[in-house]
Structures are given as C-alpha cells and as structure tokens.
C-alpha cells in the first residue's frame, strides 16, 4: 500500500494499540479486516526497549543484575539447544530473562509481570515469564523457552549461578507462611 519492502515491514515500530496485521483480498484490495491489535510486530523488544521498560516500571538495580544473570544463563543453554535442533529462540529467551522480574516487588510477580508485558504488546514473552515462578503440571519435562527460563532463574542467586540445592537453601528462610513453604517445596521439586 505504501510502497514499503514487505520483507522489512515488521521492523517498523508500532505503539501499543497499533495494528500489526491487515488482511487483503486475493486481488490486493483492502477488506477492512485486521488482526492483532495492540500486539507489537516483533515477539520481543530490543535491549534499549528492555531498559526503558525496566525504567518505566521502576525495577531496582539489584533485580536488573539478577535478570541479566538469568538472561545470560538461559541464552547460553538456548544457543546450545538450538544447535542440537531444538525449536528454541535464544534471543526471545534472553529478552524474557531481562524482563522476567519486571514486577518483582508486586504480589504474584510472575503473573503481574506477564500482565505488564501483554499490556506493552508482547504476549509471547508474557507467556514465557508468567511461568518462571512455577511451571504448569507436567511442563517441567520439556525443553522450551518457559522451562529454560524457569530453571535459569532457579539456578541464579542474586547475580551469580549456583546449584539448585544452594539456591533453595538460601531462599527457604524467606518463606514464612505455610503457603510460601509449600510453593517453595513445589518449585524445588519442579527444578
């Protein structure tokens, strides 16, 4: 319609609420039907947008350092698995790692962070980070972006990689209610 290279049109940034896809008739005419309103044309933001999102949602520096460490570890695993033929997107996983704790200071932060990313127009990333605190039943046996982010988070204490036992030993004293202790036990078993 505008003479743009169709192979590069997804590089055009759109604000939340923009239209990502317009369907045309077989003869090239516009039907007036569109899909994916409010969805960014790319699955994940670049690193500059990640920083701006972290700024917008007031993510403290110590949490950003943790997110960066999780992102590095998850990305390393994803690159190796991709080479072995697994259907994993290393850059999507790295970016999800950089934003997985965007709502860390809120209750039920994994779901709150997923809501933020959906609102910002990144529903695929939202689906990945909403499970970084606990996977859905049976999901822990697969190798997906969701399971890799979950495990990388469980093997990262603050901004350093640790084994799972140490990570859960260190976090256990923070669980002061029966529900928190049960959630901790379930996460440990999934990891």
Features from the language model and the residues they span:
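Buried hydrophobic packing segments
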Residues: 2, 73-78, 113, 117
């Amino acid at each position: 319609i505008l003479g743009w290279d169709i192979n590069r049109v997804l590089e055009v940034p759109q604000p939340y609420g923009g239209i990502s896809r317009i369907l045309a008739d077989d003869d090239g005419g516009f039907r007036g039907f569109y899909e994916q309103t409010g969805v960014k044309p790319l699955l994940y933001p670049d690193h500059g947008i990640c920083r701006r999102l972290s700024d917008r949602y007031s993510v403290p520096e110590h949490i950003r350092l943790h997110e960066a460490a999780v992102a590095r570890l998850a990305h390393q695993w994803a690159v190796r698995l991709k080479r072995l033929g697994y259907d994993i997107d290393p850059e999507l996983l790295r970016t999800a790692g950089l934003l997985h704790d965007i709502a860390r200071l809120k209750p039920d932060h994994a779901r709150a962070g997923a809501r933020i990313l959906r609102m910002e127009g990144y529903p695929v990333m939202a689906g990945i980070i909403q499970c970084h605190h606990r996977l859905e039943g049976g999901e822990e046996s697969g190798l997906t972006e969701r399971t890799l982010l979950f495990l990388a988070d469980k093997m990262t204490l603050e901004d350093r990689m640790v084994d799972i036992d140490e990570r859960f030993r260190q976090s256990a004293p923070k669980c002061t209610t029966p529900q928190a202790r049960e959630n901790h036990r379930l996460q440990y078993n999934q990891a």
